[in-house]
Amino acid sequence: DPTIDLWSLDEVHFCQHGSRCRMWVPWEEDDPVLWHYPGRKSVGYFGAVRLRDGKSLFRKEPEMFNGETFWAFLRQLETASQENGRRVVVIADNSKYHHAKLHAAWRLERQGRFSLDFLPPYSPELNPIERVWKRTRRNCLHNAYFPRLALVAESVEKQFVRWSEPNAELAQLCQL
């Protein structure tokens, strides 16, 4: 429908310890030492991608995800998606804070022009933005050592800057 802008929304944590995947090691090296941060520190982001053209919006969340932080991101998304006057429908999962009473009245007030559509429970594979998170991890975090959490955020945000304008890569990645 050309009168609707469909957005995919989700939140993610990028861990400091990174991940190792395929790599090449010279045959003469018996046991390569691979640096790996031993903790469970992570940096969180809200993200949304407009499926029509790949326009994206990302927001770092330094504390935790909850109803207040989600509401702040929804307001930011509403502002970013108003440029063309289309109705905005946002695909989201069933996290408890997506249904919070805190922003229920706000959502009801905007229901005609800005609404949330929830995925079935326990089905993250149906959310197109999950593929964006996977690509971000592969491009920014695989086979890399991050001695500080700030370096993880820096690496991820460089990718987000590359995706800041509507682009074909995200549009193709998020095709339904």
Where are these regions (language model features)?
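Extended, low-complexity cationic-aromatic segments
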Residues: 1-75
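C-terminal anion-handling pockets and recognition modules
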Residues: 2-6, 129-176
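Acidic/histidine-rich, metal-coordinating catalytic segments
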Residues: 10, 85-99, 122, 127
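RNase H-like polynucleotidyl transferase catalytic core
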Residues: 31-38, 108-131, 145
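Short, basic/hydrophobic alpha-helical segments
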Residues: 69-89
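Distinct, well-ordered alpha-helical segments
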Residues: 101-106
